[in-house]
Amino acid sequence: MGRMHNPGKGMAKSAIPYRRSVPSWQKMTAEEVQDQIVKMAKKGLRPSQIGVILRDSHGVGQVRRLAGNKIFRILKSKGMAPELPEDLYHLVKKAVAIRKHLERSRKDIDSKYRLILVESRIHRLARYYKTKRQLPPTWKYESGTAASLVS
């Protein structure tokens, strides 16, 4: 898939194992994985961070194979899902950081341009999530209140 505001093609990807069964060396059960996910979510970790910790520290390659559901769906069933989707959250966080930088250095023209690009990505992604009903139809990105969304 190509990049939105870049000429790069983005060809790097990881290969998912063909076998869909749980590996024989896997020691954790589905309940233990779900407990770990809930425990890490209570600490304030995002779903991708939870997946990285489970992969690196506990040897769980794919939560979906072991637990039957993805991390986000497990959190959603427990009522602990984040209110903003993760990719939108990180774009808003980046826009807040650029805006904070622009307060200190107003003449940075390149950062102004990058802020426009990031905010256009935010608007496009918000429109997508509104059609998928993961965001309420009244949700709107406003630069003044964006810092409260990511704090």
Curated annotation (Swiss-Prot):
**Could you give the subunit structure recorded for this chain?**
Component of the small ribosomal subunit. Part of the small subunit (SSU) processome, composed of more than 70 proteins and the RNA chaperone small nucleolar RNA (snoRNA) U3.
InterPro entries, alphabetically?
Answer: Ribosomal_uS15, Ribosomal_uS15_arc_euk, Ribosomal_uS15_N, uS15_NS1_RNA-bd_sf
Question: Any idea which UniProt keywords this protein has?
Answer: Cytoplasm, Nucleus, Ribonucleoprotein, Ribosomal protein
Put simply, this protein is called Small ribosomal subunit protein uS15
- Compartment annotation: Cytoplasm; Nucleus, Nucleolus
MF terms (GO), sorted A to Z? small ribosomal subunit rRNA binding; structural constituent of ribosome
Similarity comment:
Belongs to the universal ribosomal protein uS15 family.
Q: What does this protein do?
A: Component of the small ribosomal subunit. The ribosome is a large ribonucleoprotein complex responsible for the synthesis of proteins in the cell. Part of the small subunit (SSU) processome, first precursor of the small eukaryotic ribosomal subunit. During the assembly of the SSU processome in the nucleolus, many ribosome biogenesis factors, an RNA chaperone and ribosomal proteins associate with the nascent pre-rRNA and work in concert to generate RNA folding, modifications, rearrangements and cleavage as well as targeted degradation of pre-ribosomal RNA by the RNA exosome.
Record gene name: rps-13
What biological-process terms (Gene Ontology) are attached? ribosomal small subunit biogenesis; translation
Tell me where it mainly resides: cytoplasm
